[in-house]
Design a protein with these regions (language model features):
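Phosphate-handling catalytic cores of nucleic-acid transaction enzymes
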Residues: 1-458
Length: 458
């Protein structure tokens, strides 16, 4: 048996996740340090927000706190940023927005304070600019005052051009917080057809972006952009997300979906959130915000790059080889594309999890260790299952009434003969059903062995 498989920490993690699964939560909260696990538990018990939403929002907040200050290197020339595109899916009233507000509050507080500082500095700047150069010199002020910039983390609806300007002033990174994600992707074609979507495809990979502004002498050059995205979306409009080229150009595959098993409306209770919970969460994020970083001669951040220990890298490669075998057996190109993006995400998860543990005093940040890799694997498996569930919903939305009726009548596990009988009873010919079955392997159905199948979402 491998040494990492009998580590006591892994056994404790499994026990924690078993407990949460029994309560109807699939998100592996054991990936977080004990301090953050307690925060998630208290927020859930007090407000009845789904644990999946709280955990996903907290994961994204930690990623934003890291931003461009730390990167992870898997091998020479292959470096990843902790960029996440996260979508919380649920029915109206499913408490999707409130967990986001809790997780992002430290950034809101920071942005508010920085805006106060900016307003004062801007008033002073305007006052100086209203003076002549001679008057400024005589009063002991700078001859050529520098216009102040507003430091911030959070942005909402903004064009790529406006976003580039804000990012140039905030090189640590930004987070697009869209309460309704549908507004984000519906705006992709509002100006130049498809250009905004291409912008977000590039940002996901942290590719250099250049924005040429109208009537400007210089371009805005972002060497390594960092913009994470998080927001909510209703289950019934998921199909909007897959419209146009978004399902064929891999855009939708870059989104991490969170869809709790339990979609019940929260019941009110008398439990109050302990005062120290919000304080502890603020302290965790503020430690990330306040960490020092080095700027080079061009004003660019020199990130701290984390490598993997040999054991950690060995475990990661072992997982990837197994995952590649899944891809080789998969006949659905859409599913293969999702798996390929998850191979990128697992590296990013490693960085986020290691830094979360460091922030809570559970480890150092010299290397990414095996415990972090194991936790990243569990998180990746969670998002894999979520992505498959979303694909199933998208495919069901695309079914005609006859196909939908047959899918509904099929048992969770079935043979080809059973399925053909149900299909024929509903007016579908055998050959047509065989084609329908084969076309939906990996999205609606899973092939167990020759002649035997199961429904992905029974």
């Amino acid at each position: 048996m491998d040494t990492y498989s009998i580590n006591p920490a892994f056994i404790i993690d499994e026990a924690i996740d078993l407990s949460t699964r029994l309560s109807g939560t699939a998100f592996p909260v054991s990936i977080f340090p004990v301090k953050i696990q307690r925060i998630i538990r208290e927020v859930h018990e007090c407000h009845n927000y789904p644990t999946d939403y709280i955990a996903a929002a907290i994961l994204t907040a930690i990623a934003v706190g890291i931003g461009n200050t730390h990167l992870v290197q898997i091998k020479q020339g292959w470096i990843e940023s902790p960029i996440l595109y996260m979508a919380l899916i649920g029915r109206p009233g499913a408490n999707k927005s409130h967990p986001l507000s809790f997780a992002m509050k430290p950034f809101l507080d920071y942005d508010y304070q920085q805006n106060q500082v900016f307003e004062k500095a801007l008033a002073k700047y305007d006052e100086l600019m209203s003076m002549s150069r001679k008057e400024r010199t005589e009063s002991g002020e700078e001859q050529f005052p520098q216009e102040p910039v507003r430091k911030r983390f959070l942005i909402s609806d903004v064009t790529p051009e406006g976003l580039s300007l804000i990012h140039a002033q905030n090189k640590r990174g930004l987070c697009l917080w869209a309460d309704e994600l549908s507004a984000w992707f519906k705006n992709f074609n509002r100006y130049n057809n498809g250009s905004e979507e291409q912008f977000w495809l590039s940002v996901f990979s942290a590719k250099t972006t250049i924005s040429d502004r109208k009537n400007a002498k210089s371009s805005i050059f972002i060497k390594r952009p960092y913009i994470s995205v998080i927001g909510t979306i209703q289950k019934k409009i998921l199909s909007e997300l897959a419209k146009g080229e978004r399902s064929s150009n891999g855009f939708i595959d870059r989104i991490l979906f969170v869809m709790p098993n339990l979609q019940q409306k929260a019941r009110w209770n008398d439990k109050e959130l302990p005062e120290n919970i919000e304080q502890e969460w603020n302290a965790i994020i503020n430690k990330l915000i306040q960490q020092e970083y080095v700027l080079n001669e061009f004003g660019e951040i020199e990130p701290h790059i984390l490598l993997f220990t040999e054991d950690a890298k060995r475990r990661l490669y072992e997982w990837q080889h197994h995952f590649s075998e899944l891809c080789d057996r998969e006949t659905n190109d859409t599913i293969v594309s999702i798996y390929c993006k998850l191979e990128i995400y697992i590296i990013r998860f490693c960085l986020i999890i290691q830094l979360a543990r460091w922030t809570c005093g559970e480890c150092d940040k010299t290397y990414i260790d095996t415990l972090t890799v194991e936790r990243a694997i569990k998180l990746t498996e969670y998002f894999k299952e979520s992505a498959l569930s979303v694909q199933n919903i998208l495919n069901e939305n695309a079914l005609n009434s006859q196909q939908q009726a047959i899918v509904n009548l099929l048992p969770p596990a079935f043979t080809t003969a059973q399925a053909i009988q149900i299909a024929e009873q509903n007016g579908m010919k055998e050959r047509t059903f065989q084609r329908f079955l084969n076309d939906n392997i990996g999205t609606l159905f899973r092939k167990e062995k020759h002649g035997e199948y199961s429904k992905i979402n029974p």
